Each structure stands twice: as C-alpha cells, then as structure tokens.
C-alpha cells in the first residue's frame, strides 16, 4: 500500500492492517514520506484510536530499521522501559528499579531517552548519577556482558527516527510514536515490564507484546495515574506468560506500609529528581525505597525468580537497605 492510500484509509475511519502500518512506517524510516503526509497519518490514527494491528505494524518497522547488536547474548534479558508521559512528576522509578534488578543479578538492557515531559528522563538521571548513556554500540554491548546492565540511548539505536522528529515536535501531542518506543528495544528482550500513561493502553500493549512473542511481560497503570506500580494506590496490570494473557490488580496495603511521605517520590525539578534518586540509592528515602523496591519486585516476578510481586518487593527492598544496590552502582560507574 502506498503511503497516500494508507492515509486515505485512516481518514475514512478504517484501521490499517499490521502489514499496511508496517509498510507506511518503513517509508517514513527511509525518509520517503513528506511531513504533510506523515502529519496527516499520525493525526488521523490518533483520532481513530490506535489499534493493536497498527501499533504492531509500526513497532515491527521501527525494530527492522534499528541498529542491531553484534553480540549474541547467552542469557535472558529484561527491559523496564515505560511510555512516560503520565504527567505526575515522580522520580525515575523504572530506571532506579532497573539498577536494583541488575544488582540482584538480572541482566537489564534499559532502553530509554532524554526527558520528554518529566523533569528528567532515564538518560538524564543516569547521566546525573555518573553513568554515561551516550556511548558506542560496542561499549553498550560490552557493558551488558561484563556488568549485567546497559543503557540503549534511543536516538543512537534508532537513527531512522530523525525523519519523524520535526513532525512530532510540531504536532506536540501524543502519537503512535509514543507507544512504539518502549516496544522497540533493539536487543529484543524476551522479558519486559512496561508502565503506560493511560489504563486503556494496558490491553493494547500486552496484545502487541503477545504478537511479538515475548516469554513473560507485564503492563501496568496505577489508579492514582502513575505509569508504574504505586505504593499509594491499587495498580492494575495485564500479564503475559507463554502466550497467555491474564489481568490482575495489586493493592500496596498487602505490604503493610503506612505514613509514607509523597514528597519523597515527587520531584519539582531536575536537580530535585537527582537528590531524591541519590537518597534512594543511599537508603535515605523511606517512600522512595518502597516505591523502587515494589517496581523492582515486579521485575523479579516477570523474570520468574519469585512467585509473587510481594516476595520480589521484599528481596529488592533488602538489596537497597543493605547497601547492595548502592555498591553495585558505585562499581558500575567507577568503570566508566
């Protein structure tokens, strides 16, 4: 299908097949679609509501046009990349939980970018903490093999996205590109936890992950609006295991937490986000420790290392409080 035909189909309020969406996005990645046509495509798809097939097709195109690792990794990989954009201003919980997971022996290939709507994106906070995120492809792969943690800076691994950049910036609203980023880790991890900015996206994302063939994956959104597990409210999540999707809720009351200070997990600026992140790593933030441990616990659950998220939370919390995570991260950045 030619790009113009795909746009006309969307304008008629019809959804594209995965193949049609992939074809259009392949043209975009090669710089063969005009800014006007791409703008029309993104706007029409947004008005119709992105379908599973459309998101899947666009994801496949982004994956195919990404740089590929030269290394064959002989171990299971986890990514904790979320959509962001929940507008809540929390600390970088998914990034900090990735560090906790790596300190517990989980191989983490963290896919991320600079800030879009928050004070600090995953790349921003890691850089502030002393971890260099914009390195060579060879270094990124070596870090994973030798250290158990690496960061894939999205603009480096998805150079073809430069063709969509100006239109995305000019439009200024969420499009399918905000969805396919977390689904397009170039290392193709078979295990993934994704927080989404809207509850209705949980079903869409888990079905796309199912189609992509992941072994185990979890997509979550909390009832207080977070794109991660909340320590203050119930978190709903969809779960994929061996091709089967199930739906669940997690109530943090089961953890027995009380009198938590929300100010310990909400940042007012980039500098403040760094201060709060360091407090978590130094075991100086009660609420921050619980929030990061809970999300790391969910990661352990996705990896199949424990039977329940609660068990994972306890293990992750101990890693933070004992100083294990701090030592791991200090060793990590000392080798930079």
Curated annotation (Swiss-Prot):
Name the cystine pairs: none
Pathway assigned to this chain's UniProt record: Amino-acid biosynthesis; L-tryptophan biosynthesis; L-tryptophan from chorismate: step 2/5
Q: What class of enzyme is it?
A: transferase
Note on how the cofactor is bound: Binds 2 magnesium ions per monomer.
Q: Which domain of life is it from?
A: Bacteria
Residue sites binding 5-phospho-alpha-D-ribose 1-diphosphate per the record: 82, 85-86, 90, 92-95, 110-118, 122
Q: Which keywords label this protein?
A: Amino-acid biosynthesis, Aromatic amino acid biosynthesis, Glycosyltransferase, Magnesium, Metal-binding, Transferase, Tryptophan biosynthesis
Give the binding site residues for Mg(2+) 1. Answer: 94, 228
Sites where the protein binds anthranilate 2: 168
Q: Provide a GO biological process annotation.
A: L-tryptophan biosynthetic process
- A GO molecular-function annotation: anthranilate phosphoribosyltransferase activity
Mind naming one GO cellular-component term on file for this protein?
Answer: cytosol
Q: Which residues bind anthranilate 1?
A: 82, 113
Question: Which residues hold Mg(2+) 2?
Answer: 227-228
EC number, UniProt record: 2.4.2.18
Q: Does the keyword Amino-acid biosynthesis apply?
A: yes
Catalytic activity reported: N-(5-phospho-beta-D-ribosyl)anthranilate + diphosphate = 5-phospho-alpha-D-ribose 1-diphosphate + anthranilate
Q: Does the keyword Magnesium apply?
A: yes
Q: Which residues form the signal peptide?
A: none
The residues that cross the membrane are none
Needed co-factor(s): Mg(2+)
- Biological function: Catalyzes the transfer of the phosphoribosyl group of 5-phosphorylribose-1-pyrophosphate (PRPP) to anthranilate to yield N-(5'-phosphoribosyl)-anthranilate (PRA).
Under the subunit heading, UniProt states: Homodimer.
NCBIfam families in the record? trpD
By sequence similarity, the record places it as follows: Belongs to the anthranilate phosphoribosyltransferase family.
Please give the name of this protein: Anthranilate phosphoribosyltransferase
Species of origin reads Leptospira interrogans serogroup Icterohaemorrhagiae serovar copenhageni (strain Fiocruz L1-130)
């Amino acid at each position: 299908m030619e790009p113009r035909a795909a746009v006309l189909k969307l304008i008629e309020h019809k959804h594209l097949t995965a193949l049609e969406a992939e074809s259009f996005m392949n043209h975009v990645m090669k710089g063969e679609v005009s800014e006007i046509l791409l703008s029309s495509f993104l706007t029409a798809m947004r008005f119709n509501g992105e379908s599973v097939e459309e998101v899947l097709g666009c994801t496949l195109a982004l994956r195919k046009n990404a740089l590929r690792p030269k290394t064959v990794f002989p171990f299971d990989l986890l990514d904790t990349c979320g959509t962001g954009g929940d507008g809540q201003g929390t600390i970088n919980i998914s990034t900090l939980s990735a560090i906790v997971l790596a300190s517990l022996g989980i191989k983490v290939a963290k896919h991320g970018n600079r800030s879009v709507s928050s004070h600090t994106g995953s790349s921003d906070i890691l850089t502030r903490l002393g971890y260099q995120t914009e390195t060579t492809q060879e270094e990124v792969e070596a870090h994973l093999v030798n250290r158990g943690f690496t960061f894939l800076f999205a603009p480096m691994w998805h150079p073809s996205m430069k063709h969509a950049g100006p239109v995305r910036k000019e439009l200024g609203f969420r499009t399918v590109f905000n969805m396919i980023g977390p689904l397009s880790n170039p290392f193709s991890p078979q295990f993934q936890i994704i927080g989404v900015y809207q509850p209705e996206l949980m079903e869409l994302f888990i079905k796309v992950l199912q189609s992509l063939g992941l072994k185990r994956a979890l997509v979550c959104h909390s009832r207080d609006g977070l794109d991660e597990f909340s320590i203050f409210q119930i978190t709903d999540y969809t779960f994929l295991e061996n091709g089967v999707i199930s739906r669940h809720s997690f109530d943090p009351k089961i953890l027995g937490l009380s009198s938590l200070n929300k100010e310990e997990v909400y940042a007012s600026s980039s500098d403040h986000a760094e201060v709060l992140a360091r407090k978590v790593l130094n075991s100086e933030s009660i609420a921050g420790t619980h929030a990061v441990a809970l999300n790391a616990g969910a990661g352990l659950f996705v990896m199949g290392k424990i039977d329940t998220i609660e068990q994972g939370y306890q293990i992750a919390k101990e890693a933070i409080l004992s100083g294990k995570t701090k030592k791991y991260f200090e060793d990590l950045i000392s080798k930079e």
